[in-house]
């Protein structure tokens, strides 16, 4: 697969809280780091996303009396999570082992108190933009390659919204890890297939 100057690598949420020992660890989450390092040199454009929640964020189960992490919010229907990636904390920091000195942007998401944000393109209300589409258009980007955490949530929804926003999207499967709550990996893969988002291996780049 040929990588050009109109492609960008999007590294999603490789943060301490999503890695082993964190507040919301994705199994083997830190295993994506060497894969990302191996492919980063192929890309002229590298962008990072960072979950960045205020204390008491609406996505936290602790903000909903009587609810537990991984319950569904009966009002929004969205998954509730343990407190994680609280702005300014160690857990919210990009994992120290991830070294991408050429990264040109860190896009923070989930910082609005009453709206969660899985996607790098839109908040979960599906209308509030996070700015990545405008950034890509201003720089003439055409195709986004996605890696990071978690495959079945923030990576997958970012790839779907890239397509929705008029870009091509590719998910680098071995550069991602998923949580897989209630079949969420299979559900995400079905959505990606319907949207025409290919899954590739890093060796194919």
Which residues does each PLM region occupy?
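Short, flexible loop segments at boundaries between secondary-structure elements
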Residues: 170-185
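Active-site flanking residues adjacent to catalytic metal/cofactor-binding acidic residues
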Residues: 12, 50, 173
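Extreme N-terminal starter segment of soluble prokaryotic enzymes
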Residues: 2-9
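Histidine-anchored nucleotide/phosphate-binding helix
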Residues: 36-39, 153-166
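Active-site alpha/beta core segments
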Residues: 34-143
């Amino acid at each position: 697969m040929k990588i050009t100057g109109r492609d960008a690598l999007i590294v999603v949420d490789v943060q301490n809280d999503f890695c082993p020992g964190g507040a919301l660890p994705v199994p083997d989450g830190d295993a994506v780091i060497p894969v990302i390092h191996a492919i980063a040199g192929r890309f002229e454009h590298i962008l990072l996303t960072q979950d960045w929640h205020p204390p008491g964020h609406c996505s936290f189960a602790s903000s909903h009396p009587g609810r537990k992490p991984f319950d569904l919010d009966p009002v929004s229907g969205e998954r509730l999570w343990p407190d994680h990636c609280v702005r300014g904390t160690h857990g919210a920091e990009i994992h120290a082992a991830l070294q991408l000195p050429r990264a040109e942007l860190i896009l923070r998401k989930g910082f609005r108190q009453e709206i969660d944000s899985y996607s790098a393109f839109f908040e979960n209300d599906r209308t509030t933009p996070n700015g990545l589409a405008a950034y890509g258009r201003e720089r003439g980007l055409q195709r986004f390659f996605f890696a990071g955490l978690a495959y079945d949530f923030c990576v997958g929804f970012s790839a779907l919204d890239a397509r929705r926003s008029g870009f091509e999207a590719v998910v680098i499967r071995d550069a991602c890890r998923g949580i897989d709550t209630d079949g969420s990996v299979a559900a995400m893969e079905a959505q990606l297939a319907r949207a025409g988002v290919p899954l590739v291996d890093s060796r194919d780049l």
